Design a protein with these regions (language model features):
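C-terminal flanking tails of non-heme Fe-dependent oxygenases
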Residues: 1-79, 127, 131, 135, ...
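Non-heme Fe(II)/2-oxoglutarate
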Residues: 81-128, 133-138
Length: 325
């Protein structure tokens, strides 16, 4: 598990197995799993926590100017009042080496470059760890590991510029003391890796929960341990063999920092469900993404918009019920 550097260059059979049978079963049934980070990746994540703390300590205008928000909440710096602030990376911005790179405030050039280099290093390490888990999943499902070739094209390293972006992202959070929360939700992608510096992340125990009485478990709260979450795309590709991991963030009196890497399918190729034992139909990457997004409330946007999204969802459900009657 320590040697991740050559995972993307392995022979056709893919990287060596990582997860034992019982952990694969847990990931399938619960939709989540705790795993120790390889030492190199743990060190990189520790560096990223330090760099992100320096970034979040900057004045608001400097953060917003350094990473302007766009694509809703899917790119750049964003604040949710009384809950959290976060920066979303989908490509390099200040270290891209192109004229299109943003001009950061002069006083923070060095720290921004350090933040971005460390984020790119963490992206690579997290992606290769999740790639190993996906290869385990393929073998466990009696599939060839090559099923991930097109789906992961361009996702295993931070893209150099916006025109090379896929849906995959790395997000740095600072949750405010006591009030920093995230409502229960599942993620959209294939697998998500979460590491926090303090407690607050909780996962749903599907085996003991009912609709009326959910049972929440404290997830790993150490910088050397990651929580792996299965997402809605993996659920769809596996034909519901893998549940999506339901999770939330509850308030911590001291606040909380976290690193979240969401590995999502590539936008460069159609997705062939036939490779995963389906009926052989192919969908465009963008169409699959829109399908996965349907009915989802964006828990990382401001409360007013979350409420509006829920209202729209309830209205659509009511209209569908009328049509069925």
């Amino acid at each position: 598990m320590d040697d991740m550097s050559n995972a993307a260059c392995c022979p056709p059979q893919g990287p060596p197995p990582l997860l034992p049978e019982h952990q694969m079963l847990q990931l399938a049934q619960q939709g989540w799993l705790s795993v120790p980070l390889p030492p190199d990746l743990a060190g990189t994540v520790a560096e990223l926590f330090a760099s992100s703390a320096t970034f979040f300590d900057l004045p608001h205008h400097a953060k917003a100017r350094s990473y302007p928000s766009k694509s809703g909440t899917e790119f750049g710096y964003y604040v949710v009042e009384k809950e959290k602030e976060y920066a979303t990376f989908r490509c390099r911005v200040h270290t891209a080496g192109t004229a299109a790179a943003q001009s950061p405030p002069p006083t923070s050039i060095k720290s921004l470059h350090g933040l971005e280099h460390t984020a790119a290093k963490a992206w690579r390490g997290c992606a290769l760890l999740l790639f190993r888990i996906l290869c385990d999943l393929a073998r466990w499902s009696h599939l060839d590991v090559s099923v991930w070739d097109d789906i992961l094209d361009g996702t295993l390293a931070m893209p150099a510029a916006e025109e090379q972006m896929t849906y995959t992202l790395l997000r740095l959070f600072r949750y405010f003391p006591a009030t920093g929360v995230a409502e229960p939700h599942t993620d959209l992608g294939l697998l998500t890796l979460c590491v926090g510096d303090r407690g607050g992340l909780e996962v749903l125990d599907r085996t003991r929960s009912t609709d009326e009485h959910p049972v929440w478990i404290n997830a790993a709260s150490q910088a050397q341990t990651a929580t792996i979450l299965a997402g809605q795309t993996l659920k769809a590709l596996s034909h519901d063999t893998f549940n999506a991991g339901i999770h939330r963030v509850v308030g911590n009196p001291e606040g909380r920092h976290s690193v979240v890497f969401a590995l999502r399918h590539s936008s460069r190729h159609d997705v062939d469900f036939g490779l995963f034992g389906g009926q052989g139909w192919r969908v465009r990457a963008s169409e699959l993404w829109r399908f996965i997004e349907v009915g989802k409330v964006n828990i990382n946007t401001v409360k007013k918009r979350r409420d509006a999204q829920r209202a729209d969802e309830e209205l659509a459900a009511s209209a569908l019920a009328v049509q069925i009657q």
